[in-house]
């Protein structure tokens, strides 16, 4: 599909699905996230010395962009994340890439300062499939609303400082949260540990909860952060200019989908206190106060089955077996979303 048609398709998808608060108009993304083409990169750094200590200093590295517009940029790298930074979970942890110099006006990284990079975790080919399914989850939510994180897939040659090759694997960059907020004409809520459900934008919260149910992700919270941390767990909150901890109409923006049943990573387990057998068992966790908005969104999303399935089918390098399983898993959700009786049953288990 040519770029023009892709852009037209994306615009049509937003106009149909971004039904919540249509007055919120989003700006376009920066160059890195203006295309879905797979980047070709080389990342050079002392990977054997990168510390997983949360207090460790970043290490210097070099990022090279291949293709028709090659460029070389100094960067600093640091380990990030919680579960995936643990050595027993990931041999290769997720990284934060910070640009040591401002990328030039013609750079694909123009306007970027620091980015999260989701890496392959383990050498096994299966882990590339888990990564691609998480990447797909981000793109599915992006198709539902511009109030979401953009992602960009890359084939990355990792090399040591002496030029010795380490490994070549797919990874993906996640849009900086401040760019998400700015792109949507909002302001980020900071320094707040907990909010009430009544402070959330009802349509945005319902959309969030239904989407997490669709991919069977339980590793999130819209109103509180982890112990000792700011709100929210695997979500960021944004609101109108001048937003405070007492504001209403807050929009939750989800991220980190590796614990989703759609991905089914081997290290993913249900959170404490949620009693399901495994992460593939769906559990609806939307608020009862948002049931009407959730039902409206379920009706809306059930009509978009084909366009959302097309996003899964477009994901590069997914194995046929992986694609079929994911399609079947999402298909179960769409069958439920299209059944009034099943939707009614779903609303009965909402959070009060």
Please state what every model-predicted region is.
Residues 4-18:
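Bacterial N-terminal signal peptides
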Residues 19-25:
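Sec/Tat signal peptide C-region and signal peptidase I cleavage site
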Residues 25-352:
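Phosphate/dinucleotide-binding and metal-coordinating scaffold of catalytic cores
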């Amino acid at each position: 599909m040519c770029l023009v048609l892709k852009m037209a398709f994306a615009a049509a998808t937003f106009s149909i699905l971004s039904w919540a608060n249509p007055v919120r108009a989003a700006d376009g993304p920066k160059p890195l996230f203006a295309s879905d083409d797979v980047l070709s990169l080389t990342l050079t750094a002392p990977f054997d010395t990168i510390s997983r200590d949360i207090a460790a200093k970043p290490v210097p590295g070099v990022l090279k962009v291949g293709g028709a517009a090659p460029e070389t940029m100094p960067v600093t790298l640091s380990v990030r994340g919680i579960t995936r930074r643990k050595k027993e979970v990931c041999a290769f942890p997720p990284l934060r890439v910070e640009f040591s110099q401002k990328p030039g006006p013609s750079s694909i990284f123009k306007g970027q300062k620091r980015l999260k990079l989701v890496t392959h975790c383990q050498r096994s080919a299966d882990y590339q499939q888990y990564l691609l399914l998480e990447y797909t989850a981000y793109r599915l939510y992006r198709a539902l609303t511009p109030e979401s994180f953009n992602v960009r897939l890359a084939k990355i040659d990792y090399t040591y400082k002496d030029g010795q090759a380490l490994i070549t694997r797919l990874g993906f960059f996640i849009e900086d949260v401040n760019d998400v907020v700015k792109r949507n004409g909002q302001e980020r809520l900071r320094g707040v540990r907990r909010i009430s459900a009544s402070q959330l934008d009802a349509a945005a919260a319902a959309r969030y909860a239904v989407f997490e149910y669709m991919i069977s992700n339980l590793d999130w919270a819209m109103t509180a952060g982890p112990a000792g941390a700011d709100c929210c767990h695997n979500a960021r909150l944004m609101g109108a200019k001048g937003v405070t901890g007492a504001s209403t109409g807050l929009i939750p923006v989800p991220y980190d989908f590796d614990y989703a049943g759609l991905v089914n990573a081997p290290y993913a387990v249900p959170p404490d206190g949620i009693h399901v057998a495994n992460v593939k068992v769906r559990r609806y966790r939307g608020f009862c106060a948002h049931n009407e908005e959730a039902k409206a969104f379920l009706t809306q999303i059930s009509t978009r089955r084909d366009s959302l399935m097309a996003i899964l089918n477009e994901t590069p390098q997914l194995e046929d077996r992986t694609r079929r399983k994911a399609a079947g898993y999402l298909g179960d959700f769409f069958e439920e979303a299209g059944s009034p009786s099943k939707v009614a049953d779903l609303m009965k288990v909402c959070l009060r």
